[in-house]
Regions:
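Basic K/R-rich, polyanion-interacting modules in nucleoproteins and related proteins
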Residues: 1-12, 61-122
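Aromatic-rich carbohydrate-binding modules that target alpha-glucans
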Residues: 3-48, 56-79
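Solvent-exposed loop/turn segments at secondary-structure junctions
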Residues: 20, 131-134, 163-166
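Short, solvent-exposed loop/turn and secondary-structure capping segments
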Residues: 25, 62-66, 136-141, 161, ...
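Conserved, mostly hydrophobic/aromatic
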Residues: 53, 128, 149, 159, ...
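An acidic-aromatic substrate-binding cleft motif
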Residues: 102-156
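Glycine-rich, aromatic-flanked loop segments that form ligand/cofactor-binding clefts
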Residues: 152-166
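Aromatic- and acidic-residue-enriched carbohydrate-binding clefts of CAZyme catalytic domains
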Residues: 165-185
Length: 185
């Protein structure tokens, strides 16, 4: 089920891979006050679907609560080694940032179940911007440097924002998609 809060709007459609990016009656969201919602059916478990909301017939927006976006301006800068098999942007069908929906995602299985954090007065915190911490600008490259930080006495890492934001040069404090981790990392 998709839900969009859109106060003072008259109607909303969802357009995407599942309906050839065409606003159709079956894909008009039902209104409940300032919320619009729809339950999609017939989606293939595990397949990614790009989509946007079409608001009042003229405003195309991505879902602000999506966990992944496709960006026509910045995705081209992402190396395939950093993000293999990145879903291509639907060029010619959409404009601007689009959301990605995937049903049946596998839940993350935490590997460390007995984590004990250091006492508050014993914390040595390293504030890390993934983009600037290593030449590769990736989570994997940062992970390879954890032993180095440990040898410095660091016992806690505070990640600066890692979610998607407008543009590609920022500390990430201008977020636009709070639940979508920046694919550049």
């Amino acid at each position: 089920t998709l839900v969009l809060q859109a106060p003072d709007k008259k109607y909303v459609y969802v357009v995407g891979d599942f309906n050839d990016w065409t606003p159709k009656a079956d894909y008009q969201l039902k209104q409940d006050g300032e919320y619009f919602w729809i339950t999609l059916s017939g989606l293939i478990k595990g397949e990614e679907y790009a989509f946007q909301y079409l608001v009042d017939g003229s405003i195309y927006i991505a879902d602000p609560y999506t966990d992944k976006v496709l960006d026509p301006w910045n995705d081209k800068n992402i190396e395939s080694t950093t993000y293999p098999n990145l879903k291509p942007y639907p060029t010619g069908k959409a404009e601007g940032i689009v959301s990605v929906l995937q049903t049946g995602q596998t839940a993350y299985n935490w590997k460390v179940k007995s984590f004990e954090r250091p006492a508050f007065d014993q914390l040595i915190v390293y504030e890390m911007l993934i983009r600037d911490f290593t030449e590769e600008h990736t989570f994997n490259a940062a992970k390879e440097k954890l032993e180095y930080l440990k040898n410095l006495g660091v016992n806690a890492i505070e990640l600066m924002p890692v979610n998607e934001f407008e543009g590609n040069t920022s500390w990430g404090y201008n977020p636009s998609f709070y639940f979508a981790v920046d694919k550049y990392y």
